[in-house]
Amino acid sequence: MGLAKRIIPCLDVDAGRVVKGVQFVDIRDAGDPVEIAKRYNDAGADEITFLDITASHQERDTTLHTVEQIASQVFIPLTVGGGVRALEDIRNLLNAGADKVAINSAAVHNPEFVREAAERFGSQCIVVAIDAKKVSAESDTNRWEIFTHGGRKPTGLDAVEWARKMTDYGAGEILLTSMDRDGTKNGFDIALTRAIADAVPVPVIASGGVGNLQHLVDGVQQGGADAVLAASIFHFGEYSVQQAKEFMQSAGVEMRLG
């Protein structure tokens, strides 16, 4: 018996509001992250990821307040990312109730930051978020590059080598998003997910491209992911977390069924 695989709904939050709309039935306010997080908690999600995409620094206090509110309502692990640039940011988020903190651009600018964070707070709460885009031609060996700034800025870093380096530096988990697949509903980039999962000794969360429940199964069975992250298929009520878990279980994936 391996470890049960995890389903992780993701909330993108801007200035304290969930964006990429949420259309739950009978949610009074589709933009309130606390209400939405609580809904996912009650629906049997294994974890929740909260990505703060707020550009401005002034809003950080809003974020901490929101994290505190979510943590008081939610009894599953909560990962928070976005704008994490200093050890102080991590401390503040953990104190507010986050269980794990995701580091993205700051890791690229200063890889030592990940090492310092893991030494200070423990690898178990440091997630490195990787946004990767395929840069190889179809005929060549697959190669993916790390992009920052929401996928706009190429770094020249090879995604597989970078994932290895980050786990060497102490990352306890990799949150892997395919920029090519994000928002397409065509499924995860399975080759990318598999390449990273095979390269690192820590759990990999697959993200980007989920359009149906079979995609979740493929991420685990073909991609080797330990967890699957999705936003729109859950937000828009196309599928419930419970339906997703039952579908994955029936496909032979070990799940925690509540």
UniProtKB/Swiss-Prot annotation:
It comes from the Bacteria. Its main location: cytoplasm. Keywords: Amino-acid biosynthesis, Cytoplasm, Histidine biosynthesis, Lyase. Pathway: Amino-acid biosynthesis; L-histidine biosynthesis; L-histidine from 5-phospho-alpha-D-ribose 1-diphosphate: step 5/9. Its EC number is 4.3.2.10. GO terms for cellular component: cytoplasm. It is an enzyme of class 4 (lyase). This is Imidazole glycerol phosphate synthase subunit HisF. It comes from Alcanivorax borkumensis (strain ATCC 700651 / DSM 11573 / NCIMB 13689 / SK2). The lineage of its organism: Bacteria, Pseudomonadati, Pseudomonadota, Gammaproteobacteria, Oceanospirillales. The gene is hisF.
